[in-house]
Amino acid sequence: MIVRADFARGMVRAFGHVLRPYPARDIPAGTMVDLPGRGPLFVTDSGPRDAPVVFLLHSVLTTGLLCWYPVIPELNKRYRVITLDQRWHGRGIRSPEFSLDDCADDVVALADELGIDRFTAAGFSMGGGIAQLVWRRHPQRVTGLVLCSTGPYFSTRDPRLRAQSRRTGRVLTAVDKLLPRPRVGRLDDTSVHTTVWAMRQFLSTPLSHMGHFGDGLGVFDSREWLAEIDVPTSVVVSTRDRVVEPARQELLVDGIAGARRFEVDGGHACCVLGAQWFIPPFIEAVDAASEVSIEA
């Protein structure tokens, strides 16, 4: 029952992004970028070219823009902001397997393609795990971390939950065939109501891959090397979170030397549902993690 409840909350959260979204404004245009040896993915690149760079890494079942569009206009005032659709999400790379390691390497490959040397990696939920892995696998490229509503491991670390995720994926394969897949051109149409735009973004990720996502999340565990993280790190704790419970988020605060804690009075979808309360502490968190690069 706990497993089913966790899944139900996750689906409600994903649909909540769509049905009660934060009003969209100044959504940046994007383009497909082909990463040599890896594949094509959808990318947005906005803000001052000479400003410190922040990569925004999204949560599961969303896209780079669906997860992060509320914060981009404010960030663009003093940061160059990059979003990307991760593997099998939206217009992300299609690969035989889904791996957070691969997602982390995609971030650095994209930075190479864009001519970006060093950057702050900010991630929400799944994106927080990817951000940690970007530092772990490419420490020389990361100037700071911003970890939001995430932890050092995910619930599918538990084999029972991972098995449930696979069963759910099989069920959703049939459901996914009945759902309309938005035409690519319509994903970029921001003239429609935010709910319509958000629904198109949501439907661009195949629900049939839920099992693969669960497997990819389940193998992630940073607890053994958290103490090695040596860049400015901000942790944004969602205090009403029922997906990544606050106690698990606090492990990042306690485990990373010098980590600064920020708080948002919201649940696991706070980046969009209640974004007006998420944006201020998130911007503060980015500023704190980027202090070194800004001063330099």
Which residues fall in each region the model found?
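Conserved HGGG/HGGXW glycine-rich cap/lid loop of the alpha/beta-hydrolase fold
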Residues: 36-93
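Active-site loop/oxyanion-hole signature of alpha/beta-hydrolase fold enzymes
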Residues: 69, 73, 82-120
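Flexible "cap/lid" loop of the alpha/beta hydrolase fold
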Residues: 132, 136, 143-173
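Conserved alpha/beta-hydrolase catalytic His-Asp/Glu region
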Residues: 156-158, 174-227
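Short alpha-helix in the alpha/beta-hydrolase fold that links the catalytic acid
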Residues: 222, 231, 245-253
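Short beta-strand/loop motif that positions the catalytic acidic residue
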Residues: 229, 235-237, 241
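Acidic catalytic loop of the alpha/beta-hydrolase fold
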Residues: 240-244, 269
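Catalytic active-site module of serine/aspartate enzymes centered on a nucleophile-bearing elbow/loop
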Residues: 259-296
